[in-house]
Design a protein with these regions (language model features):
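Donor-binding and catalytic core of enzymes assembling or modifying cell-surface/extracellular glycoconjugates
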Residues: 2-85
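Nucleotide-sugar donor-binding patch of glycosyltransferase catalytic domains
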Residues: 71-134
Length: 135
């Protein structure tokens, strides 16, 4: 939510939220959709992959954890910020379209880094500005 706040306070943005159906993912989705930023967001969790891919393709940027969506968006030639929390860095950096962010306090990531609570929204925001050449 902090990243969405940084973006909407500075730029005109729309967020497409592609999540799975796992409980934890749905809880995060609900939290975002019940926040002050709900009007900037569209949930894609009820769409099929084939319905989701064209939406990803038209985005200027994707911000994903290291899941299938990060690999799909990079394959679709969308600049992709990959939030690396528990996977080897190679999984989120093999494409020139992938821009990994690692947890604060870490120099690299591996399986079981357990870094999801240490991803810094400011780092994501600054990387977004760099990729999109925003001031």
């Amino acid at each position: 939510i902090e990243f969405i706040k940084l973006c909407t306070n500075n730029y005109k943005c729309k967020f497409f939220l592609a999540t799975g159906k796992k409980y934890e993912e749905q809880e995060i989705l609900k939290k975002i959709l019940n926040s002050n930023f709900k009007n900037f967001c569209k949930a894609l969790d009820n769409l099929t992959i084939s319905e989701t891919l064209p939406i990803i393709k038209i985005c200027n940027l994707a911000v994903c954890n290291d899941t299938s969506f990060s690999h799909l968006s990079a394959a679709l030639e969308v600049e992709t910020i990959v939030l690396m929390t528990d996977s080897p860095l190679l999984y989120g950096s093999y494409s020139p379209k992938m821009h990994p962010i690692i947890p604060d306090g870490e120099t690299t990531v591996t399986h079981n880094t357990l870094g999801k609570d240490k991803i810094n929204p400011e780092k994501i925001f600054n990387k977004m500005k760099e990729i999109l050449k925003l001031s």
